[in-house]
Design a protein with these regions (language model features):
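Short, P/G- and charge-enriched loop/turn segments at secondary-structure junctions
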Residues: 51, 63-66
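Active-site HxH/HxHxD metal-binding segment of metal-dependent hydrolases
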Residues: 1-54
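Catalytic cores of transferase enzymes with a strong primary signal for eukaryotic protein kinases
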Residues: 2, 60, 80
Length: 130
């Protein structure tokens, strides 16, 4: 289970997965923040990552990239390189710069983090905003 970042709407509901034996991964800053909460309903990540963490599972490679401060100081970008799928959460704008007014957002760093997002040849595939 990968937490994209520490905000509650992205970390809630993990207990059944943990009970089933899942390993939880998040950026080290998210892990530190969640440990400080001391909330028994929040699963603390087992692994805190740095700038790059690779998960190989069943022949599939998932890369977790930390691209710097933006929507939070611990947002991860997820890349499936073989499939050419890139997942960003809450900080890549399609029509506007989203979610920039959270207390832990880093507006000056948003644009720098865009430059660090892994490049993917999309072969004219659509970009979907969620």
């Amino acid at each position: 289970m990968v937490y994209s970042h520490h905000h509650y709407d992205h970390i809630e509901g993990g207990k059944p997965f943990k009970d089933a034996g899942a390993t939880f991964v998040a950026h080290m800053n998210a892990k530190t923040r969640l440990e400080a909460l001391k909330n028994p309903d929040v699963v603390i990540p087992d692994i805190g990552t740095g700038n790059l963490h690779v998960i190989e599972l069943g022949g599939t490679r998932l890369e977790l990239h930390y691209v710097g401060r933006n929507h939070s100081d611990n947002s991860l970008v997820m890349l499936l390189p073989k499939e050419k799928l890139l997942f960003t959460v809450d900080f890549i704008p399609i029509e506007s710069l989203q979610f920039r007014d959270f207390p832990d957002s880093f507006l000056p760093d948003f644009f720098d983090s865009f430059d660090r997002v892994p490049s993917v040849d999309t072969q004219n595939r659509p970009v979907v905003d969620t």
